[in-house]
Amino acid sequence: MTHVCSVILIRRSFDIYHEQQKISLHNESILLLEKNLADDFAFCSPDTRRLDIDELTVCHYLQNIRQLPRNLGLHSKDRLLINQSPPMPLVTAIFDSFNESGVNSPILSNMLYLSCLSMFSHKKELIPLLFNSISTVSGKVERLISFDIAKRWYLRDIAERMYTSESLIKKKLQDENTCFSKILLASRMSMARRLLELRQIPLHTIAEKCGYSSTSYFINTFRQYYGVTPHQFAQHSPGTFS
């Protein structure tokens, strides 16, 4: 999968120019840049080390964020974030691990990439930068819904958060051969599946967490989507169901 952003480790202090401003980069600082910006700078390899992060990893990071403030600042156009004092032993270990053949399983690699992103979690601009790196409108809609699956979502809520119109979102989703209702349903059913697979949670609680006020309606929707009831599904999953 093509990368959408990059983490750069600075190994020698130098200056760059971004949007007509000089930015001083200090030794042992790290940068997070969107793909095009990272490619444009063409950092000299002796002075930097670089990790490219793909869209799936970005989505995994955003998926674990719940109940964000209503104003996410998604209109922000920041394309570069700097952490001047990251935990260098951890940073070095992460970068070194990708140079060791046979060490990085997909699961471990994903954890290391997520650790890199988390080093910018204190920056309020992180979520907008990652969100805007997602290439499709359907992907962005899915991520917004994932921030609060239990919410009673309407298309106008998505349009408000994306600072655009409902009609434009509809058109772009049609161009991607999907629609808002399909994305909402898929997001809720994916959450239901994860809860049934991983935890022992009462059915009415699972329904509520997935945005359904009626447990019977949730059961019917789940059966139509997966072809089995939640109880039947849970019987074949590692967890138990009550």
From Swiss-Prot:
Organism: Escherichia coli (strain K12)
Gene3D superfamilies to which the protein is assigned, alphabetical: Homeodomain-like
PANTHER family, alphabetized: HTH-TYPE TRANSCRIPTIONAL REGULATOR GADX
Protein induction: Expression can be repressed by GadX, depending on the conditions.
Keywords: Activator, DNA-binding, Repressor, Transcription, Transcription regulation
Other facts noted in the record for this chain: GadX and GadW are part of a complex system required for acid resistance via the regulation of gadA and gadBC. Many of the described circuits use mutants missing one of the network components. In the wild-type situation, however, many of the scenarios are not easily observed.
Keyword match Transcription regulation: yes
Portion annotated as DNA-binding: 156-177, 203-226
SUPFAM superfamilies, sorted: Homeodomain-like
Assembly: Homodimer.
One GO BP annotation of this record: regulation of DNA-templated transcription
Function: Depending on the conditions (growth phase and medium), acts as a positive or negative regulator of gadA and gadBC. Repression occurs directly or via the repression of the expression of gadX. Activation occurs directly by the binding of GadW to the gadA and gadBC promoters.
Name of protein: HTH-type transcriptional regulator GadW
Domain HTH araC/xylS-type: 139-236
InterPro entries, alphabetized: Homeodomain-like_sf, HTH_AraC, HTH_AraC-typ_CS, Tscrpt_reg_AraC-type_HTH
A molecular function (GO) term: DNA-binding transcription factor activity
